[in-house]
Every structure is written in structure tokens, then in C-alpha cells.
């Protein structure tokens, strides 16, 4: 409390033994202990009275409650799912299954639209671009029950 080490206390005890003598030293130590106890009790009583007057307990309780509330709010933010606006999904070309006979009939042009044969030149290499979807009536792919429902 006062920053007194054991060696300093031992030195004070030796001086007291030399000054008071062995007969009066136990009584003096008892009296000193009583005085120290009274000082501690009076100091604690004054401290409690001052704290009571300024409301330190109430302030401490409020600070503690505010700290707990802020921790609970942070926990709720972490545990609660975030409310984000769903981003629109770009439609993907729908896969279709053509009937075997309908595909050959639909793809074959009429005889009147058949172009004249071209000169023998090499055909250009096909590109990797996807072809446009065919707008022929066809049956749609069967719905997989594990996928979400399709939009109309």
C-alpha cells in the first residue's frame, strides 16, 4: 500500500525492539495494529459515503449495462442474416428437346428456297459463338425436382 518492502519493515521492527525493549514491544505492536485497523475502517467508511453521494455505483452499473447491451447488439448483427437486395439474374437460353422427326423437317428448307451451288471454295471455320435459339415449337426439357421452379 505504501511501497514498504520486507527489509524496511524488518529494520523498523529491530529499531522498535531496541527502543522499547522486549517487555513493552508486544503491547506497542498490538496498539499499532489497532490504530492501523481503525484508520482502514474510517478510510473505507469515508470512501463509501463519498461514492454513495456521487452515485458511483449507479454510474458503474449503467456503464456495465451499456457495455453488455452493445455486446448483445454486435452478437445479433453477426448472427442475424444480412438483408441484401437480391440481384436480378440474367435469363439463360432454355434448353429444349426436339422430337426426332420434327427436327429434320423443321431444319430442311423448302425446295424452292434451295440456293444454287457455290463455287468450290473452302468454307469458313465455324466460330465458337453460340447459335441463336430456334423458335420452333418443341417440347421443353423435363423439370428436375431438385431445381427451383422456373419463371413463366
Curated annotation (Swiss-Prot):
Keywords: Cell inner membrane, Cell membrane, Membrane, Protein transport, Translocation, Transmembrane, Transmembrane helix, Transport. It is a single-pass membrane protein. The chain crosses the membrane at residues 1-21. The Tat system comprises two distinct complexes: a TatABC complex, containing multiple copies of TatA, TatB and TatC subunits, and a separate TatA complex, containing only TatA subunits. Substrates initially bind to the TatABC complex, which probably triggers association of the separate TatA complex to form the active translocon. Residues 116-127 have a biased composition (Pro residues). Residues 98-152 are annotated as: Disordered. Part of the twin-arginine translocation (Tat) system that transports large folded proteins containing a characteristic twin-arginine motif in their signal peptide across membranes. Together with TatC, TatB is part of a receptor directly interacting with Tat signal peptides. TatB may form an oligomeric binding site that transiently accommodates folded Tat precursor proteins before their translocation. It is found in: Cell inner membrane. Pfam families: TatA_B_E. Belongs to the TatB family. One of its GO terms (cellular component) is TAT protein transport complex. This is Sec-independent protein translocase protein TatB. The gene is tatB. It comes from Pseudomonas fluorescens (strain ATCC BAA-477 / NRRL B-23932 / Pf-5). GO terms for molecular function: protein transmembrane transporter activity. Gene3D superfamilies: 1.20.5.3310. InterPro entries: TatA/B/E, TatB. Residues 98-115, 128-142 have a biased composition (Low complexity). GO terms for biological process: protein transport by the Tat complex. It comes from the Bacteria. Its main location: membrane.
